Amino acid sequence: MNRTRSNRRILLLCTLLVCLVSMLMIRFSAAAEENVIPETRQLPRLVDRADLLSELEEEELEARLDEISERQQADVVVVTVNSLDGKSAQDYADDFYDYNGYGIGTDKSGILLLVSMEARDWHITTTGFGIRAITDAGLDYISDQFLPYLSDGEYLDAFE
């Protein structure tokens, strides 16, 4: 009798252990899928989550970004957000670029301008050819061109 009871406990513990391990494996595989960098672009080149632009302005700017990107063979991306979700502007911009599959060619060439309204912060991230094409002086020039428009709330002019 004791032996049967002991065997049942062992069987129950083994069953619980198998269930626990299975649940953990499912959780970890789902988390791993979230951090996979996709091969192709997942979103448009304009992502206006802060809703700074009208629909017409979005269409106009997205067409312009597509034209420049195809001509230069480097993704040119503009992203606006309300919150950085606890990240620095640089980390958010880098992650957004990578985990949304931006970039053209084997070196994933491109540039992304991120504007965060809540943090009143911005960042420009470059990859591939974008790193070589846009120097620190170029980044300074770009920021000098768009920051006054951004400060005045002229968002379309800032992004063009």
What positions do the PLM features span?
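Folded, non-transmembrane soluble domains that reside on the lumenal/extracytoplasmic side of membranes
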Residues: 11, 26-160
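Bacterial N-terminal signal peptides
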Residues: 14-25
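Bacterial N-terminal signal peptides that target proteins for export
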Residues: 2-15
